[in-house]
A protein has these predicted regions:
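Tandem repeat scaffolds
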Residues: 2-204
Length: 204
């Protein structure tokens, strides 16, 4: 079977119905591609590098990304369902307004990434890095956070009620002046001083 690059698959999709299905892409280096509004289903991306690519309003169904690097990429208003990102680097990428449902982010990096007004529905973060990420005004429904680093992350106007952060690093997180985002969140005794500092309580 002939191997097709992502650029070739994208060009073919643009000529037809903006639809990519059952694709397998390995070691592709893609720069400056406009994959906006593309619909990708049941496809695998492995050891691929995407630089300054646009995935605005793109949809990914049952897609797997392994050991991929996304640099300067925009996923604004993109949709992910039953997707898995494993050992991927998405530092500084823009996921504003994106929706993720029934998806897994495993051992992946999202440092400085922006998820402003994004939606996570039954999304699992497992051993991932969200240091200094912008997780503002998000809507979270039954997410699972496992050993995830949120150091310096901004949760402004993102309600965390009912969420379990016991397994995570939350040093230096940012919330609103009222700290309303933290009401009902589950933390450990070791994490309590971090939250106390946010609400102006001094522990002696």
């Amino acid at each position: 079977m002939e191997t097709v690059s992502f650029n070739q698959a994208l060009a073919a999709a643009r000529e037809q119905s903006d639809y990519i299905e059952d694709g397998t892409f390995a070691k592709d280096c893609v720069c400056g591609a406009d994959a906006s509004k593309i619909e990708c289903k049941n496809s695998t991306f492995k050891d691929c590098t995407f630089t300054d690519c646009r995935f605005a309003w793109a949809s990914f169904y049952e897609c797997t990304f392994e050991d991929c690097v996304f640099s300067g990429c925009a996923f604004t208003d993109a949709f992910f369902r039953n997707a898995k990102l494993s050992r991927c680097q998405c530092d500084g990428c823009n996921f504003s307004g994106s929706h993720m449902r029934d998806s897994i982010l495993f051992h992946s990096g999202f440092r400085y990434a922006t998820f402003h007004k994004g939606v996570w529905n039954r999304v699992t973060l497992d051993n991932s890095n969200f240091k200094e990420a912008a997780l503002t005004e998000m809507r979270l429904t039954k997410p699972v956070f496992k050993k995830t680093d949120f150091t310096g992350a901004d949760f402004f106007k993102t309600p965390l009620k009912g969420l379990d952060l016991c397994d995570c690093v939350i040093d230096g997180i940012a919330v609103s002046d009222t700290c309303a985002e933290l009401r009902g969140v589950k933390i450990t005794a070791e994490q309590a001083p971090t939250v106390a500092r946010l609400i102006g309580v001094r522990i002696v």
